[in-house]
């Protein structure tokens, strides 16, 4: 029986005899942020195990609430900051250099095809876009990873999602993953890898693939994963060119990371996305998804464009094209958070920030804040936000608030209209 790409990565990193389905694997990266890691740090210190297995393989960032909004968040940042200094972790990103982790770390070249990565964050699955196995873990596993550079994980079973066809104008990776989650359900991929393949994925940018993999967890997936290809090589080339004599050589090496034709899958889901229309969530689960047309006219109070799902430069370009020459509706607050300083700088240079500001958007520093209702865009009870984030749980962006998830194009169109609407109304700008 053949192996899936995830199983091949596991096999290459196995460091011990498996115990049933549990394998201990060697880690290429342990990523950290200020919300979950301080608990692990303090626990290790209490156990007199304040050590790290390899400072070069640990990356850390203060991103969820930055700058700190109160004494509690300041204390969390202080713990992470002092720990990074204490152990010589050069890959630490503090205020001025920091950005949303799942956009920042790939942008810095820290994720490679075939890598194994853990982090105390459920959207760690984002890194699978590069052909890596990446999983969010709890505090105990994070502690072991920091201390020993290994993690015990179930041998991966996989759901294969084949995306055929070509995206229509005004339809984006966010619409695709919402449609996939609606099909699988919020528990449909629990403890499984979601492998994204097919012509649609092949045609996607790395940013779009990261959007797909980022939301694998919303169907219960441990990890989302794509096959590395020439698009992956192009994205990473500045970081890997010293390791390969040519791009073709890198591509040849990466092409080995594919599933075998006779690999065993728990399920194969084929979707033709050629006729897919823009999607938006309703209710309080990510699998509550409808065509935007069925939610047309739903009033909104706020639009948020950003996050580890849709805060990259490609996303800001899409939104800015819709907004150019338009104004935010008087009843709507528009907020945009570029995901990293590099994204922010590029958006400035391209005139995107000027477009957002001219339209009436507030532009924030790179941060996760609003996505999880911690800062920079928290909702009041009864308010509604059309958001490019990844979760619409009850109270996610503020107690009593409602979140509708959508693409940057749909979010931008909603900001103009004051309600959920299709960006086809601004089609020439959105294409």
Swiss-Prot record:
Cofactor(s) named in the record: [4Fe-4S] cluster
Q: Which GO terms describe its biological process?
A: L-leucine biosynthetic process
Q: Which UniProt keywords apply?
A: 4Fe-4S, Amino-acid biosynthesis, Branched-chain amino acid biosynthesis, Iron, Iron-sulfur, Leucine biosynthesis, Lyase, Metal-binding
- Record EC number: 4.2.1.33
Q: Which reaction does it catalyse?
A: (2R,3S)-3-isopropylmalate = (2S)-2-isopropylmalate
SUPFAM superfamilies according to UniProt? Aconitase iron-sulfur domain
Binding note for cofactor: Binds 1 [4Fe-4S] cluster per subunit.
Residue ranges of the TM segments: none
InterPro entries assigned to the protein according to its UniProt record, in alphabetical order: Acnase/IPM_dHydase_lsu_aba_1/3 (IPR015931), Acoase/IPM_deHydtase_lsu_aba (IPR001030), Aconitase_4Fe-4S_BS (IPR018136), Aconitase_4Fe-4S_dom (IPR036008), HAcnase/IPMdehydase_lsu_prok (IPR011826), Homoacnase/IPMdehydase_lsu (IPR006251), IPM_dehydratase_rel_enz (IPR050067), IPMI_cat (IPR033941)
CDD domains to which the protein is assigned, alphabetical: IPMI
Spell out the subunit comment. Answer: Heterodimer of LeuC and LeuD.
Q: Which family does the record assign?
A: Belongs to the aconitase/IPM isomerase family. LeuC type 2 subfamily.
Give a short account of what the protein does: Catalyzes the isomerization between 2-isopropylmalate and 3-isopropylmalate, via the formation of 2-isopropylmaleate.
Q: NCBIfam families given for it?
A: hacA_fam, IPMI_arch, PRK00402.1
- Under which name does UniProt file this protein? 3-isopropylmalate dehydratase large subunit
